[in-house]
Regions:
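Short, polar N-cap/turn motifs at the start of nucleic acid-interacting alpha helices
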Residues: 63-70, 147-149, 169-172
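Conserved helix-loop functional segments at active or binding sites
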Residues: 25-33, 62, 96, 143-147
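Short, leucine-enriched amphipathic alpha-helices that occur as contiguous helical runs
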Residues: 20, 35-39, 131, 135, ...
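Short, contiguous acidic/charged loop-to-helix segments that flank catalytic cores in large enzymes
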Residues: 29-33, 72-85, 120-130, 148-155
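Active-site/catalytic core of tyrosine-dependent DNA strand-transfer enzymes
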Residues: 16-20, 87-148
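Basic, Lys/Arg- and aromatic-enriched nucleic-acid-binding interface segment
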Residues: 2-53, 57
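Conserved tyrosine-mediated DNA breakage-rejoining catalytic core shared by Y-recombinases
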Residues: 2, 58-99
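C-terminal catalytic core of tyrosine-transesterase DNA break-rejoin enzymes
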Residues: 43, 47, 51-54, 157-172
Length: 172
């Protein structure tokens, strides 16, 4: 098994199956609409092969092929094109958002429709603002379900990696 430097520096902040189940139960009973949306983004990132938060926030409808059940996107950090198979849970989340965001450029309402992805400074600011907002909300959820660490979008990425490794998949 080969891990990238990012996974090699793993800090242990991944969710167990039980913690993921508790998070899903919290989601089902959550009445705060924005927090519920952030949880949907967390679950989408997890089910989309641990997609980075910056790629969740910059995900556009043109990147989604519902017929092939895949996501095709040039990742922001690596500038490499990836094809990610979309699981049924990921597709379900996308269907919900498609109903809410019809006619919008971006899948999730984390950045302005006018954001220029080639403007590095604007992208940096948008990413930091969105990440801070999401992670503050997720941290509250993590506390409420008794996690021993602060829940964040990055925990979705780590959790996917741990689940995949436990199923014998390679992270290279």
């Amino acid at each position: 098994v080969s891990l990238s430097e990012e996974e090699a520096e793993f800090d242990g902040k991944s969710l167990s199956r039980e913690q993921m189940a508790a998070l899903l139960e919290y989601y089902k009973t959550c009445t705060e609409s924005r927090r519920k949306e952030f949880l949907e983004m967390f679950f989408f990132a997890f089910h989309a092969c641990g997609l980075r938060v910056v790629d969740v926030m910059t995900l556009q409808w043109k990147h989604i092929d519902f017929a092939r059940k895949e996501l095709r996107k040039i990742m922001i950090k690596t500038n490499k094109r990836h094809v990610i198979p979309l699981t049924e849970p990921a597709l379900h989340i996308l269907q919900q958002w498609r109903e809410k965001r019809e006619g919008c450029r971006y899948v999730f309402n984390l950045v302005k429709e006018t954001l220029d992805l080639d403007d590095a400074e604007a992208l940096y600011k948008a990413r930091n603002n969105a990440t801070k907002c999401i992670n503050q909300s997720l941290a509250v959820v993590g506390e409420q379900i008794g996690l021993p660490f602060s829940l964040s979008m990055h925990a979705a990425r780590h959790s996917f990696a741990v689940f995949a490794l436990n199923k014998g998949l390679s992270m290279s």
